[in-house]
Amino acid sequence: MELKKMRGALVLLWLANIGVALAHINGYEDQPLSKIAIHKTTLALRDSASLRARPTTLGTKVCIYIYTYIYIYYTGEDIDWVTVVLKNSEPHADDWIGVFSPGKFEATLKFELINQRSDFSFALFSGGLSNPKLVAVSNLVAFANPNAPVYPRLAHGKSWDEMTVTWTSGYNIDDAVPFVEWGLKGESRTRSPAGTLTFGRSSMCGGPARTVGWRDPGFIHTSFLKGLWPNSEYVYRLGHRFPGGSIVWSKLYSFKSSPYPGQDSLQRVVVFGDMGKAERDGSNDYSDYQPGSLNTTDKLVNDLKNYDIVFHIGDISYANGYISQWDQFTAQVKEIASTKPYMISSGNHERDWPNTGSYYDETASGGECGVLAETMYYVPAENRAKFWYKTDYGMFRFCIADSEHDWTEGSEQYKFIEECLASADRQKQPWLIFSAHRVLGYSSDYWYAQKDFEEPNGRESLEKLWKKYKVDIAFFGHTHNYERSCPIYKKQCTSNEQHHYSGTVNGTIHVIVGGGGSHLSKFSQVQPNWSIYRDYDFGFVKMTAFNHTSLLVEYKKSSDGEVYDYFTISREYKDVLACVYDGCEPTTHSAV
């Protein structure tokens, strides 16, 4: 095999499997794969070294693996385990496949593979990460159907009675027509067509997404399930119909539709940011880039029955230009996103790239410039390139901002934010929630402590909107920790209460929930008086609306799922109507 072709094959292998794990050694913005100089690989093949992978056909059975925290993981058409038998009579300390230090070496290793629309092989390298030398290559292994429909992810449509299903496959529209078969549980089903998207290397804005990180994303399909009954159980499966009439199916999934806006029922929402991904086979033990990611995922999988919708508020996969990592992420959250609406926000690691219209002139997206997030996931935005949107869930109104585009007064997004807040019917939807990735409010993270405890220009334009429209809670990520403020306005607490808030909406509570999984961020040494609770750990927030007057907000750690901080809001409609401070409308007396 020519070295050029070999390099291409090894990039495919490395990005798809073993390498997903290695090396976040230094640098806040690094992607682990960026540490591997795979483009410098030279041939050093030896007859004395060999690898053999088995089985060669994957995804033909269903097994159950039980991990710590009793996480049951199903393999099938999209995920499976491979055993790699390695022999090397001339071991060196800088040899690597995944993570090991060889001595006299003959070993059997196990790797978990996901279906990425192609076959796989394993390779043994010497020379470390910066000067890799190819020593041996295994046989090929492949899934029984590499093109199968996989990794469904649900999201709200643009109306409360619409659910969207997005998934990935290897089938273009000319190969097989995509659709979803769905219906109320136990009743007859109907079929809804799906649209198909993809993109090429030329859509990437720079490297590594356009260079060593590029990988064909396959085809992304989205179907719109409309006219849903409120609070009802539905089942669905993904299908592709070939020209001859035969159909390839996914397995059967289920979801519960949204309540009618304003419906008085138990409603539970999970919020976190900055989760990323990790590998269950241990291949990232060399350096954990998102060490809390699997704990957060597993806690949410184990608790599926106890929440209704998820908001992942930016920094989704941390692919940073290594395209294969989006498949890895969608596979990791499949058990969640296939059952619950999985609503995402745009973060710096999804969008930012110089001279592409992002508000920050940074390179955090690795050249993706928003294309991956906008294609791999659906959100009910008018234009997904402008990643702001509103969505309703029962008694909640969510206004989701895009911190990577201009939000300051007079901007297009500012007008959207005001319209979203102003149009909420607080008699029916008392719980008004604002969210963005970067901290546009308050945080005492180490970096923000040097910048007035906010993103530059963060709250100056927005705070008057939060006050005018009486926003209950503002959620942010970006800083990898948890922090909760008092109800606050213009840097001043508007209540001395710590946990139980009631009466007039006189300030917005700011919650930083960026500890979803990526490496943690330190706090400033000084804790401002508005900072009620801080935690340097991984976790997520769960909101529970019991009715129109009672809301519980809990912060849970990913390590044990226990509650470490909480607060409640008790409020009647007249409290929402009441004016506060300089936000009172003018009044007069009638003539009679």
Residue map of PLM features:
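C-terminal structured "cap/appendage" subdomains that terminate the fold
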Residues: 527-528, 537-539
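A positional/structural detector of protein chain ends, strongest at the extreme C-terminus
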Residues: 1-4, 590-592
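Extended, solvent-exposed regions of the mature portions of secreted/cell-surface glycoproteins
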Residues: 2-145, 282, 287
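Metal-dependent phosphoester/phosphodiester hydrolase catalytic core
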Residues: 144-512, 516-523, 532-534, 542-591
